[in-house]
Regions:
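Hydrophobic pocket/interface hotspot
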Residues: 17-21, 27, 50, 69, ...
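Hydrophobic ligand-binding cavity/cleft-lining segments
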Residues: 1-38
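Hydrophobic-ligand binding "helix-grip"
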Residues: 56-114
């Protein structure tokens, strides 16, 4: 497992960037960089289970991640603990594939920089997915910046 880090300076206050990153409609827009049709079910409230979903590019069936919000400090920090996967619409936290994701964290930090916001993303990734996320995350953050600054 490797830890990856990405950041982007966005010319807007933290609350605006926070909502653009986490509210349903803008989330669906900026996460197209990961998977066309991405969305989530659940809440960003601390302790809540949240499902990150979208069509599986190979099967067309619903797939994604089962996760828990480990921490939520409004406009400051979100910590997502991945618990497993969703395959064909079914949650899986026990298979070998699902266990690879268990205890992986994805953290978003929002820092004020003279009225702009520096978004930092830290995530734990299996070696086989490093290249994919190194390509997708910068695209996603650029799309988020574009949405907020337009």
């Amino acid at each position: 497992m490797q830890k990856l880090h990405f950041s982007m300076l966005i010319n807007a206050p933290k609350d605006i960037v926070w909502h653009a990153m986490l509210d349903d409609q803008p989330y669906r827009e900026w996460t197209k960089a990961f998977n066309e049709g991405s969305y989530y079910k659940g809440s960003w409230e601390k302790g809540s289970t949240i499902l990150f979903l979208g069509p599986d590019p190979n099967t067309g069936e619903e797939g994604g991640m089962v996760s828990r919000i480990a921490e939520n400090k409004l406009y400051e920090f979100i910590s997502i603990e991945h618990l497993g996967i969703v395959q064909n619409g079914v949650e899986d936290t026990t298979s070998e594939v699902a266990r690879k994701w268990a205890s992986a964290f994805e953290n978003y930090m929002f820092k004020d920089k003279d009225g702009a916001t520096e978004v930092h993303v830290d995530l734990d990734v299996e070696d086989e997915h490093v290249e994919m996320f190194n390509e997708m995350w910068p695209k996603g953050l650029r799309k988020l910046k574009e949405l907020v600054e337009k």
